[in-house]
Structures are given as C-alpha cells and as structure tokens.
Amino acid sequence: MAKKVITREEEEVRELIRAEDLWEPVGPTPMPKITDLRNWDMRLLKTYKPWYAPFCDLCCLCTYGKCDLTEGRRGACGIDIATQQARIVLLACLMGCSAHAGHAGHILEYLIEKHGPDKKIDLGTFVELEAPNIRTVTGLKPETLGDLKRVIEYVYKEITHLLDSTNSGQEGNYLDYESKALHASMLDHVGMEVADIAQIVGFNFPSSVADTPLVDMGWTSVGKTKPVILVVGHNPGVSTNIIDYLQANKLYDKVEVCGICCTALETTRYADRAKVIGPLSRQLFYVRTGIADVIVTDEQCIRTDIAIEAKKVGSALIAGSDKACYGLPEVSEREADEIVKEMVEEGKQFLILDHELAGEVAVKVAMKLAPQRKKEFVTEKEAQEFAKKCKECGICEMVCPNLFSIGKSMADVAKGNFGKLREVFNKCIGCGKCEEECPRDVPIFKIMQVAASKETYKLRAGRGPVMDTEIRNVGAPLVLGTIPGVIALVGCSNYPDIEDVADMVDEFARRKYIVVLTGCAAMVAGMKKDEEGKTVYEKYPPDFDAGGVVNIGSCVANAHISGAAIKIANIFATLPIRANYELIADYILNRVGACGVAWGAMSQKAASIGTGFNRWGVPVVLGPHSSKYRRLYLSRKEEDDWTVMDGRTRQLVDTKEPSPEHLAYVCETKEKAMVTIPKLCIRKNDTPQGRSIKLNHYISLWKKYMGGGLPDDLHLFVRRKADIPIVFKKEVMAWLKEIGWEEKPALSLPTLIGTYPTKVKLEAVIH
C-alpha cells in the first residue's frame, strides 16, 4: 500500500497542535473540517432521525421567494421543506456558536493584552486534564493564553465555511445540514471552553474547589439606599473592572453591584459580595423598578430596548460591547470626568469599549446620580389605582406565551387581592408582551412590584471545571450504573413554571443522581425554598458526586459539563482523547449515563449548546416552548435497528433496547420530564445492579408523576430478570409474563465503531 502523502494543510494543522508533543499520539481527526466527522453524524442520524415541526412553511431568504414549501413543493432554488428547516437549524446553531466564540475571542484578546500571551494556564491542583473539549476536538494541549488563540481562530475558520453552506444554491440535503449543525455545535463547546478557561486564568475565578461561597440572590437583596450598578449580559470584562475600581478606591462597601444573566454569575465568581437579581426573565421587571442608578450592558441576552427602558426610569446606561452599541456614541478617547458630567447632568448614554474606563465611569456616575434619584417601590394603594384601568379585554392573556390569567389578576388587584398576581409573577418569563399590547396602557410590571416576593435566596457561586479527583471517584459507578446518572440543567428562563427547575433538582439529587447546573437554570434552581427555608444549594453538598448539586458557572461553563463526560472516558477508561472525537463520543453515547435538561431554552445559544451535547452522544430534554426550534432527534423505539458491535467478541448484536431512546426530545409538562430524564440515563453498558437502580427510579417516578401503574415501555429496558428492581419484582414479573417478554442478548462492550465507515479501529474501544 502506498504511503499516505501529508498535505500542506495537514502539516499546518500538525504544527498548530504541536504534534511532536508526546502527551498522547495524535488521533485521526485533528482540527476536523466539516466532513471529517460526517460519518459519525450520519450514524447518529440513522437512529435518531430529525423530526421537523416547521415554524413557517415558506422560504423567504432570496429574491426568488417567497416560496411555498408545503405538500411536497420545492422552492425556486430546488430546496424542499425538510432541507429548509435543517438550514434554519444550522443558522440558529451558528448564531449560538458565534455568540460564544465572539465572547471567547473578545475576552481572550483583552486578557492577552493585560497578561501577555505567555500567561500559563493553571486550573488548580486538582485539574490536570484541562481543556478536554479542546484536546479531543483539535488535538492541542493548550498551555498558555496564546495557545487558546490558535484554538479560537480554528473555530472562526470553521464558522465561515459552515455559514457559506447556508447561502442560496449550496447544500441540498437535510441530513448534511444536520451534520453541519452538529459540527457548528461541537465548535460551540470548544469556544465556550476557550472563554471560561481564559476567564479562570485571567480573572482568577474559582477552580479546583467545590465549596464556593453562597451569594445573595433576589431583586430585594440589593439595598435602595446605596448607589446601585446593574450589569447585564455575559462578558465580565467591564464588571470585573467595576469591582477593581471600587476596591482600589475603598468604595467596595459603599456601592451595590448586582447582575442579571450570566454576567451576574461571572461577577459573583470574582467578588462574593456582588449580588444576583435573577435570570433573563427578571430583566425587564427589575429595570423598570428604577432601582439601578447605572445599567452596564455587555453582550448576549440583553433586551434590545434596554437603552429606552433605562431612559424611562432615569437610570444611566453604559454599553460596553461592540456586539450591542444601541446607536450610542463611542467615547473611549475622552476623559472619565467629562463623560461622567454629561451622563449625570444631561442624561446622555454612551458606548465605552475601554473596560477600565467603563468601570471607572460606572462607579462615578452611580455615586453622583444616586443622591438625586428617588427610589420607591409602588405601594399597594397605587397598584390598585393602576389596576382599575383594566377592563379585562383579554388581549394580555392572548399574547402571553404561557397563557397566564393576567386580566383576572388585575381585576383582583383592583379589589385589593394580590394572591393571583403573585402566582403570575412567580411564573412570568418577563417578555413584556402583555404590557406592550394593552390598549389602556396598564403598567402591569409596575403593579407586579407589590406582588413580587421580597425574599432573598442563596445561590452557590460557579465553580468551573469538574476536578480530576472527582472523576476518579465517580467514573466507575457512573459507567456501571450504580450512580444512576448525571443530570445537567442548562439554558434560558423561558419556563412554563419557574419552580420546575428547583423541583427537578430536588427530586434527582434526593435520588442520588449527580446534578449540575449552569446559566439561568443555576439561578432559578435557587429561587425556591423548602419547609426549612433552604434552597437546593443549602440542602445538598456541592460535590460532583451522588446527591451533589453543583453550579458549574455561566453559559460558557457548559463546556465543563461535556468536558466531565470526556474526562470519564480518559481518566476512568484510559481512552486516548487527542484528536479522537469519534472514539470518545461513542464511549459517552454507550456508556456514560448523562442527560441534559434545557427546560427554559429560548436563544440560539441554547440550541447550539444542546446540539453540541447531542454530537457527544448526550440526550437533551427540552421544555414545551422548544418545539419552536423546529427540530428534534427522535428514535422510533421498537421500529428502529438497535444493533451495535460488541467490541470484545467483534460480533454485531441486536440489543432490541432503545437506549438512549432519543437525543433531543420535547416534554410538554414537568411530570413528563420527570419520567423521561431517568429513562434517558439508561445505557447499554449498565451492569444488572446499575440497571436495577435506574429502573427503580424510572418506575417509582412513573408511579409518582403519571398516576400509578408501570411504564408502558418498561419491557424494552429489562434485559434479564436481574435487571428488575427488588421492590417492584413481583409486579414487574407478572406484567412481563402477561405481555410475553423475552430476555435480550448478552453484550459485553457496546460500541457503534464497526457499524459504519470510520478511521477508528475497533481495537481502540477496548480498554
């Protein structure tokens, strides 16, 4: 056989990843291009077929259109409706990936300017396997901030090629668009990892520690008597400089710094006296209270009318990112005091891209403006007068995404009854559509001030990567099934009920699952107290272990969750990860019992985060609004072929077991989610003891939330009698006998390697 010729492009990649470094041999896919992992994608999509729910039946992307794609029609360019939906999915994933990659690139450039490119990456004593996503995808072991720049430039390059494919007259097959969406979303996890590692190193965020501080959360955790600075977004470049300026000028105890969305989480990782108002759903409500003297925005998940809303209530506003300029003049070349004077005396709003200057200006404006402003909550009497304007026309209820009884609540408030409105506020996702559409201009969000809970909650500050020592402790129990699974609650706050997340965390932590959280989900998990007045962060230990509840951090910290799954393959199973994506993803799919839950997913970022988990082989449960993403990855249960390779016997085995059953699945109710999540943690590699534990949870949760009886698909997950939980054995055996259940084939080492064309050798899966 002729020796393979290494191309110039391959040589460049080998140079970029320092292929001569001998920490591991370079695997088959260093810095993979769009088609390098296509066969893996197609194998996944063979089992987990895309299921489309078109949000729109038209294509309006080019001047040939509009084109009606219903009833088998094709557009003027030849595209069909499935391919059009897949293209929109790819565009959404690219938006999400670009948001995180842009964040990563920006914060990386800032920190390189501050510390230099040779700043060493050190994630603490207990994290030796840093950057598992970067290592597995690119083949590079990053040692400095400068190395991270190599990685993010690879991500930028791939994004360009992927976006190219969405132009008119390009890709014509829906499965290939799905493969590209999976590729974009894999890159998203790489970009997120770059961002959070850079932040940990550059800002000295917590790492190699589980017991991070408990910080205050809630809209009344912030005092009205002090100057208040509200930071909104995801990029901590400005917020950390606000803290630095306060500390340098001995003002730290004289000014309140609080946040909404992930900048809040990042700021509490930097300073535990900072406070969290809450998730995205609390943004409009809190801005309209007028409590913030200065609002500082950066990027992502910020209301695009925030400058207008700030002006209405007399809050000063500084935009701190080129991603969201709001039409404001950029003043980084001007003196701080000159900017402050115009903001305080003339009410001007500015774009300030110099983070240090923005931090200084924010503090000075807050201290000058606060004494001039009257901050008062709406009284019950005022709320009653406002509510009397409501004529219960029902328009607010029609436009509410969750169909809440807003009009009836207003009628009650007018009579002095606030109970119904309190229920509405607690579930409100903060979109503001009700007030926007009200024909009588009832100030619904102002009225909500009297109904909103005045309680302060506790949130554990984000802790960053899962430690290698923790992986060593839980690797075997997770793979064998005796720890029933890792549940990762992530994503935005577009919930049907905001308390659902806390209920899920409590249910699964109590059952000794490992529960990890990020972003808005991490916040809302702490916004419910039990009978003893404790949140889940006070009730459960912060360890990555059975029964632990772990706040990993912000949106970009999601990379540490996928990273933990990779670490299990490397640290526990000793599989080589360097440029070895397929091998590791195959291991995770077949042997690591993990399930993501994006219960309030709203943004394109949430779409790419979830799809990135899917490519790794981790299923994701989505909330009811997520059907609007247009696409799910569903199996057909018994109808599908569940044949895998037994890596030890080298024989194909029809397992007859749909595990995991789906990769992306929408649940319409919390109750349905409660029984779906444990089922999606079932893996073919489970030992009889592990499977028995998992089925015990599946059955007991079914009885608790679905009205009793046994799950109608239980027989699909019982391989042998030893899998049946002892407590339900008599009931299950009687039912299995009734339906004619038969034992399933034995399997020693499940893998998809060998069932599709791949460069990965079957021997590689044996460890």
Q: Model regions: which residues?
A:
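Metallocofactor- and cofactor-centric catalytic cores in central/energy metabolism, strongly enriched
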Residues: 2-440, 444-767
